[in-house]
């Protein structure tokens, strides 16, 4: 659970008189719960710093400039598992970076712009086999090839368009259908983990749209 906006307001009011310079820390008002420790310049976070969850686990460590994440940094979940490591600009992911599954397996490595995947990248299954290799645009797969859980070619996308297949981590088919502008658009089918068909319908901008056929499975 993160710090709510009221807590942040109280913290900013507490330190309004005088500007911080050098090393310092921030706690939630009227508690000893640490939420930040690092360097300041003219009252703003500048230089090395660390953010913390309420449970005292590390949330982020990296470089700040003018109060925002800038430069190299690492993000963690509340159980200290790494989620992301890479470059930031003005508080957003920019440049090269890596995302991780909660078991520390690599999930994605590639380029970012304004917090989204942009440029070359490789997405991975949890078994280290490539899921998609190619180019992203505004967080969407745009040009490249997709692979099944065994590493065999499953689909190809050009300029955000093509027919795609997505898989569960047990290798079973999850979705197959049409892709346009980097999203599910057109006819598609969804499947259970046991390969039984769940649903087939039309999609628009990544969402189910219009009439569809829901397949009931009686166990």
Where in this protein do the model-derived segments appear?
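Glycine/tyrosine- and acidic-biased, solvent-exposed loop/turn segments at the edges of beta-strands
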Residues: 1-219
């Amino acid at each position: 659970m993160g710090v709510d906006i009221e807590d942040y307001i109280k913290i900013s009011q507490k330190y309004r008189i005088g500007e911080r310079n050098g090393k310092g820390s921030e706690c939630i008002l009227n508690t000893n719960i640490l939420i930040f420790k690092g360097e300041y310049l003219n009252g703003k976070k500048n230089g090395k710093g660390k953010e913390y969850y309420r449970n005292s686990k590390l949330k982020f460590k990296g470089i700040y400039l003018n109060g925002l994440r800038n430069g190299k940094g690492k993000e963690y979940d509340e159980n200290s598992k790494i989620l992301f490591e890479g470059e930031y600009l003005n508080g957003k992911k920019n440049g090269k970076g890596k995302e991780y599954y909660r078991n520390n397996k690599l999930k994605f490595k590639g380029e970012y712009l304004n917090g989204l995947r942009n440029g070359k990248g490789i997405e991975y299954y949890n078994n280290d086999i490539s899921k998609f290799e190619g180019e992203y645009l505004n967080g969407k797969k745009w040009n490249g090839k997709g692979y099944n859980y065994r590493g065999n070619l499953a689909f190809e996308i050009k300029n955000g368009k093509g027919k795609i297949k997505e898989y569960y981590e047990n290798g079973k088919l999850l979705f197959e259908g049409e892709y346009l502008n980097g999203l599910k658009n057109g006819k598609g089918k969804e499947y259970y983990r046991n390969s039984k068909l769940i649903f087939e319908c039309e999609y628009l901008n990544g969402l189910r749209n219009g009439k569809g056929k829901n397949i009931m499975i009686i166990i």
